[in-house]
Curated annotation (Swiss-Prot):
Pfam families: Adeno_terminal
In-chain residues carrying the UniProt-annotated modification O-(5'-phospho-DNA)-serine: 580
Disordered: annotated span: 386-411, 645-671
Family affiliation: Belongs to the adenoviridae terminal protein family.
Species the sequence originates in: Human adenovirus C serotype 5
Location(s) in or outside the cell: Host nucleus matrix
Identification of the protein by name: Preterminal protein
Modification after translation: Preterminal protein is used to replicate viral genome, upon genomic encapsidation it is processed first into iTP and finally into TP by adenovirus protease.
Function of the molecule: Protein covalently bound to the viral DNA that acts as a primer for viral genomic replication by DNA strand displacement. Assembles on the viral origin of replication in an initiation complex with viral polymerase, DBP, host NFIA and host POU2F1/OCT1. During initiation, the polymerase covalently couples the first dCTP with Ser-580 of pTP. The terminal protein stimulates the template activity over 20 fold compared to protein-free templates. Neo-synthesized viral genomes are linked to two preterminal proteins, one for each 5' end.
Length: 671
C-alpha cells in the first residue's frame, strides 16, 4: 500500500517538511541501483541498523535536516536513508501509558521480492509490564470471626461494585502545569489537594517541581491495599475520561438507563418479598400506558444514583441470590435476559397496572408504541444524531387490528407482571442498543467493559451452591481488580494501535499476548498464565478469554488440587486453548491459596510488522553510499566503527566497485 508524506509524518514522529525533504519511497523495484547494495536487502539493513545508524534509538530523534541528532557521523546534517514507519508511534504509545517497564526486542527486517514489487518490512516485539499490588484486602484480615459476618461482607462488596458499575461518572480533566513543593520528597497519589494549592502560585519557587498528577493517580489505583473501594469502576472511569462531548452525553444516558432498570427491578423484587408492605402513595405511582412517553417518567422516578448504604440495607429484604440476578440483568444490558420471577400478581413494582385500557392490554400497547417512543426519546437528547431516523411503520389495517384485539381477548388471562417487566427490559435494552450505535467508534468498544457480567454470574453460581466463603470472596475481589486493569490496558492499546486508522492501515498486529504472573511477598512466582491472540480482533478476544478464565477460576477457590475427573470439566469451563500456557500452571492457579499472593505482574507483549520507506533524495543516497563504503572498509580491516555522533569527517567515495556485501547479505537479483 502506498504511503503518503502525511502518513509517514504521523507514524514516524517527524514533521511534514522533513518527510517532504526525505521523499519516501516504498517500492524500490527498478530503483535498486540508486542505493548501495547494503541499503536494499534485509541483511544489509540489519547490519546498518545495528552497527552504523542504531535505528532502534535513532528513529525516536528529531531527524530534520540540520537537527542536533544529524550533525555528525553517520548522517552529516541529513535524515537517514530509511524510516521505519510506525515504529516511533508504537514506542510513543507504550511510553504514554502507565507501564513500569518497556522493552523492545527482535528488531528484524524481511524482504518481499517479486516481479514489479520489492519492499522491506520491519518487525519488533514490544513487552510492556506493570505490577499491581493485590495483597491482603483489609476486610479479610481485620475480622476475628469471619464466618459470622460473611453475609455482611458479601453484601458490602457487592454494593461497592454495583455502585461502581451503575453510578453516573463525571470526567475529571486537568489542564496546565501542577507544581508541588518539596523536591525529592515522596509524593503520595492522594496529595492532589496540595497540588491544587501549589498550582495557584504564579511562579515556580525553589524546592518545587512539576508533577504528573495523572501518573500519580494511576499508580494509586495499582495498589488494592491503598485504593480499597475506589478501585472499583476504574476501567469505566478511564473510558468516559477519553470520551468527547457527544459520547459523554450518550454514555451518561446509558448508565442512567441501567441504573433506573436496576432500581426498578430491585424495588419490584423487594415488594414481592414483603407482602405486608404498605401501599405506595399515589404521587409515586405511574399510570401506564396513559403516559405514552413513559421512559422519561421511568428515568425521573428510578435513575437516582445507586447508593451503597441502601444496597447494604437490602440484605434483609432481598436474598443475595435474587440481588445477584438483578445485578446481572442490569449490568448485561442491552444483552442478557430479565431476572426470573415466579410471582404472578399484577404488581409491576411501583407501576400501577390496569389489565386493559381502551380495549387493549397494557403490555401489548407498550410493545406497539415502543419504537416510536424510543425514537422520540433519542431525538430529545442534546446530541446530533449520526444516523438518519427511520420513520415508524404505518398503523396496521383495521382488519388486522381487529384480529389482534381478538387475540388479546383470548390471552387476557396470561397478561402478568412477568410480561410487563420483560417489556420494560426489552424497551430499555433496545434504547441502549440504539444509543450505542450513536456512539463514535472509539467509544463503542464495549467488548472491553463487559467482564463484570462474568464475575457476577460466577458469584451467582457460587451463591446457588452455597459455596460463598472467605477464599471465594478473596479471589473474586482480586481477580475483579486484575480484570479492571487488563480491560483498561487492552482498551488503550486497541484505541491507539487498531482503532487509529492510519496506523492500522500500514502496520500489522501479528501477535498480542498477555502474561499474568502472581508473586509472593519475596517476589517468587506462584503461578504464571499466558493468553495469545492474533488478527484484527486480537485485543477484544484476549479480554473475552481472560474475563471468562478468571471468573471460572473463582469458583475453584479453596478446593485444593483438582481430581483427574475434574480437570477436563475445568478446562472446558475456561475454554482452554493450546496457546494458553502450561496446563500445570493453570491447575496451580486454580488450587493455590490466594493469601500467598502479594502482587500480580501483567505483561502485554505485541509483535508488529510495518513498512520501511527509502529516500529518493540523491544527497541522502550519496551520503549513505559513502558511509557504507567507509564502514565496510573498517570492517574488512577488523577496526571498530565510529560511535554515533562521533566527529568523523565525511569520507570520500572510493573509486572502483562497491565494497563487499556485509555478512549474510545476498547479491542483487534480476527478474
Amino acid at each position: 500500500m502506498a504511503l503518503s508524506v502525511n502518513d509517514c509524518a504521523r507514524l514516524t514522529g517527524q514533521s511534514v517538511p522533513t518527510m517532504e525533504h526525505f521523499l519516501p519511497l516504498r517500492n524500490i523495484w527498478n530503483r535498486v541501483r540508486d542505493f548501495p547494495r547494503a541499503s536494499t536487502t534485509a541483511a544489509g539493513i540489519t547490519w546498518m541498523s545495528r552497527y552504523i545508524y542504531g535505528y532502534h534509538r535513532l528513529m525516536l530523534e528529531d531527524l530534520a535536516p540540520g537537527a542536533p541528532a544529524t550533525l555528525r557521523w553517520p548522517l552529516y546534517r541529513q535524515p537517514p536513508p530509511h524510516f521505519l514507519v510506525g515504529y516511533q508511534y508504537l514506542v510513543r504509545t507504550c511510553n504514554d501509558y502507565v507501564f513500569d517497564s518497556r522493552a523492545y526486542s527482535r528488531l528484524r527486517y524481511t524482504e518481499l521480492s517479486q516481479p514489479g514489487h520489492q519492499t522491506v518490512n520491519w518487525s519488533v516485539m514490544a513487552n510492556c509490564t506493570y505490577t499491581i499490588n493485590t495483597g491482603a484486602y483489609h476486610r479479610f484480615v481485620d475480622m476475628d470471626d469471619f464466618q459470622s459476618t460473611l453475609t455482611q461482607v458479601q453484601q458490602a462488596i457487592l454494593a461497592e461494585r454495583v455502585v461502581a458499575d451503575l453510578a453516573l461518572l463525571q470526567p475529571m480533566r486537568g489542564f496546565g502545569v501542577t507544581r508541588m513543593g518539596g523536591r525529592g520528597r515522596h509524593l503520595r497519589p492522594n496529595s492532589a489537594a496540595a497540588a491544587a494549592i501549589d498550582a495557584r502560585d504564579a511562579g515556580q519557587e525553589e524546592g518545587e517541581e512539576e508533577v504528573p498528577v495523572e501518573r500519580l493517580m494511576q499508580d494509586y489505583y495499582k495498589d488494592l491495599r491503598r485504593c480499597q473501594n475506589e478501585a472499583w469502576g476504574m476501567a469505566d472511569r478511564l473510558r468516559i475520561q477519553q470520551a468527547g462531548p457527544k459520547d459523554m452525553v450518550l454514555l451518561s444516558t446509558i448508565r442512567r438507563l441501567k441504573t433506573a432498570y436496576f432500581n426498578y427491578i430491585i424495588s419490584s423484587t423487594s415488594a414481592r418479598n414483603n407482602p405486608d408492605r404498605r401501599p405506595l402513595p399515589p404521587a409515586t405511582v405511574l399510570s401506564l400506558p396513559c403516559d405514552c412517553d413513559w421512559l422519561d417518567a421511568f428515568l425521573e422516578r428510578f435513575s437516582d444514583p445507586v447508593d451503597a448504604d441502601s444496597l447494604r440495607s437490602l440484605g434483609g429484604g432481598v436474598p443475595t441470590q435474587q440481588l445477584l440476578r438483578c445485578i446481572v440483568s442490569a449490568v448485561s444490558l442491552p444483552h442478557g435476559s430479565p431476572p426470573p420471577t415466579h410471582n404472578r400478581d399484577m404488581t409491576g413494582g411501583v407501576f400501577q397496572l390496569r389489565p386493559r385500557e381502551n380495549g387493549r392490554a397494557v403490555t401489548e400497547t407498550m410493545r406497539r408504541r415502543r419504537g416510536e417512543m424510543i425514537e422520540r426519546f433519542v431525538d430529545r437528547l442534546p446530541v446530533r444524531r449520526r444516523r438518519r431516523r427511520v420513520p415508524p411503520p404505518p398503523p396496521p389495517p383495521e382488519e388486522e387490528e381487529g384480529e389482534a384485539l381478538m387475540e388479546e381477548e383470548i390471552e387476557e388471562e396470561e397478561e402478568a407482571p412477568v410480561a410487563f417487566e420483560r417489556e420494560v427490559r426489552d424497551t430499555v435494552a433496545e434504547l441502549i442498543r440504539l444509543l450505542e450505535e450513536e456512539l463514535t467508534v472509539s467509544a463503542r468498544n464495549s467488548q472491553f467493559f463487559n467482564f463484570a457480567v462474568d464475575f457476577y454470574e460466577a458469584m451467582e453460581r457460587l451463591e446457588a451452591l452455597g459455596d460463598i466463603n472467605e477464599s471465594t470472596l478473596r479471589r473474586w475481589v482480586m481477580y475483579f481488580f486484575v480484570a479492571e486493569h487488563t480491560a483498561t490496558t487492552l482498551n488503550y492499546l486497541f484505541q491507539r494501535l487498531r482503532n487509529y486508522a492510519v496506523f492500522a492501515r500500514h502496520v500489522e498486529l501479528n501477535l498480542a499476548q498477555v502474561v499474568m504472573r502472581a508473586r509472593d511477598a519475596e517476589g517468587g512466582v506462584v503461578y504464571s498464565r499466558v493468553w495469545n491472540e492474533g488478527g484484527l480482533n486480537a485485543f477484544s478476544q484476549l479480554m473475552a478469554r481472560i474475563s471468562n478464565d478468571l471468573a471460572a477460576t473463582v469458583e475453584r477457590a479453596g478446593r485444593g488440587d483438582l481430581q483427574e475427573e475434574e480437570i477436563e470439566q475445568f478446562m472446558a469451563e475456561i475454554a482452554y486453548q493450546d496457546n494458553s500456557g502450561d496446563v500445570q500452571e493453570i491447575l496451580r492457579q486454580a488450587a493455590v491459596n490466594d493469601t500467598e499472593i502479594d502482587s500480580v505482574e501483567l505483561s502485554f507483549r505485541l509483535k508488529l510488522t510495518g513498512p520501511v520507506v527509502f529516500t529518493q533524495r540523491r544527497q541522502i543516497q550519496e551520503i549513505n553510499r559513502r558511509v557504507v563504503a567507509f564502514a565496510s572498509n573498517l570492517r574488512a580491516q577488523h577496526q571498530l566503527l565510529p560511535a554515533r555522533g562521533a566527529d568523523v569527517p565525511l569520507p570520500p567515495l572510493p573509486a572502483g566497485p562497491e565494497p563487499p556485501l556485509p555478512p549474510g547479505a545476498r547479491p542483487r537479483h534480476r527478474f
